[in-house]
Amino acid sequence: VEEWKIAKTWVLVHDMGSPWAVEYFPWAYSEPEKGRYDFQHADLVVEYAYAEGITILARVDFVPQWARPKDTTTRYLDKDRFSDFGDFIYAFVSHFRDRLRYFIIWNEPNITAEWGYRPVSPEDYTELLQIAYTRAKEANPQAIVLVAGLAPTLEGEQSEWGMSDLLFLQRMYAAGAQPYFDALAIHAYGGQLSPDDPADPDRLNFARAELLREIMVRHGDAAKPTFITEGGWNDHPRWTKAVRPAQRNAYTLRAYEKALDEWPWCQAVCLWAFRYPRPAHSYSDYFTFVNADFSLKPIYLEVQRYAHGR
C-alpha cells in the first residue's frame, strides 16, 4: 500500500471521530524467512495512526509459507510450529513496545476457514494463546493480550464448518485459558436485526456479545474488559442479509449508544470495515465506511456527526 494511502486513511479515521481502530498485521509480511524481520510497512501504519491519536488493536495471524506445509492456507499452523508464532509475537511486541499495547491473537479460530480447513479445536487454540500470551508478556509486561474475535455461528461440536462461539469459549475455559488473556475480542454482527434485538443462544445478532460476557462472568472474569473488533450491518441493495442504508445508519448509531449506556464492560466498538484497498465487487463492499477511492459513504458522515455531537 502506498504511503499516502496509509496517511490519508488515518486522517479520515481521525476526522470521523474514532479513537480506536483494529489493524491487521500479517505475520507472513513481517517475517518472510524464519528470524528475518521486516517491520518497515508496519512502522508506517503505526506511525501515521499514532500521529492522529488513534489507539490500535493489532490483530496478528497469516502464516508464512516457511511455517506451514505445501498447499495449505495462510491460516494453517501445526502445533509443532506454535513456538514459531510465539517467537514472532515476542519480536513484534518488542519492536512496538512504546507504540502498541493491544494484541489480538489470531482471528475466528472457531471456523474451519480460519483454522486452515481443519477441524477446529478450542484446546489447540488455547495452547497457541498461552504461548503467544507468555511471549508477549516477556517482551512487554504491560501488553494487553486479547482472545481472537470468534465468528458468531450456531454450528454444533461436530460441524464440518466450525463451532458455536459460545461453546468454543466455554471449552477454552475448560482447557485452562483463563490466565492467558487480558481481554476478549468480540465479533458482533447484526444481520437484519436491530441492536436492541435481545440476546438468544439460538440467534445471531449484535446483542449476542452479552452471552459471551456472561460466560466470562461465570468463570470469574468479570473484571476483564471486552472490545468489539468486528461487527455492524451491510447495506447491499440485493444481498439477502443486508438492510437498507437508512436502517444501517440508525442501527449503527444505536449500537454505539447501547454499548455506552448498557455495556460498561465493553471498552470500544470497532465495526467492519473502514475501507478496502480495492473494490471486492461483491456484497462485502457494502460493509465499508469509505470507498476504495476514498469517497465518503453516508454511513461515514452519520458516524462523524454522531461522534462530534456527543
Per-range role (PLM):
Residues 1-24:
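Boundary/entry segment of secreted carbohydrate-active catalytic domains
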Residues 101, 182, 229, 267-272:
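A short, local hydrophobic-aromatic micro-motif
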